[in-house]
């Protein structure tokens, strides 16, 4: 059995060596297990690429990939998956929050017959805002891209090679790993692992980054938002028709009561706002089609160590 560990790296020059050593120590507990570590520098502004090159020079089981610009975590994972040669591929973070020491929990669960197994955290070390964002993301993923309700997804997961082979066939620049997994298989499992505090620094995701990730996932792999827009349009039309009938009835029955400009203005603002929102949603889909037709790259490799 050969394991491939794929780690996107960003602002982790002081932590990635610790994570790599933890992987080495963990694999050593299962004699006969071969492994490789694929480290993808997502154009980090710190010196992590120099650290990766040093690690790769000292150990031929470590592969380093440097992207030409910051393409994002999911594109960095796709770059790593393209170079993974193991039977099982494990994804984890570069900051020590995901417990590499519990990798064989994922392996053992996968060998029960699953295609993909996610580690989940009974007690998360994330702050309240990130936990709320994770909960919102889960509910939206269940409603829009078909995530099973009983499944908990995290950035610590393992996949069989054939799943990775299917994922890397995705050519467009809007990679969203969970969406690619859910459309490839429904044979998914969970196993509980420990969630630790990061070794150093803070999350690279801002509020804007998280919102962008959600939009990317839900517009790249589902047309349900467009169908929802259709129903919202129908609902607004029915509300407008009903309001019109009510105004006519009120004028006929109570002609002395003046027509309310406040209610009319509120209605116009509501309908106008909904129209702009739905036009923005449609524009997002059209823009993605345009970018895909222009063959924008999913990632560009500047340098590699192998």
Where are these regions (language model features)?
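Structured catalytic core of nucleotide-sugar glycosyltransferases
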Residues: 1-126
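Short conserved micro-motifs on helix faces and helix-strand junctions that flank
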Residues: 8, 67-69, 92, 157, ...
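Protein kinase-like catalytic domain
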Residues: 24-27, 168, 294
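Solvent-exposed polar/charged
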Residues: 57, 82, 108, 112, ...
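Acceptor/aglycone-binding surface of glycosyltransferases and processive sugar-polymer synthases
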Residues: 63-69, 73-83, 88, 97-175, ...
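Hydrophobic helical membrane-anchoring modules
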Residues: 176-306
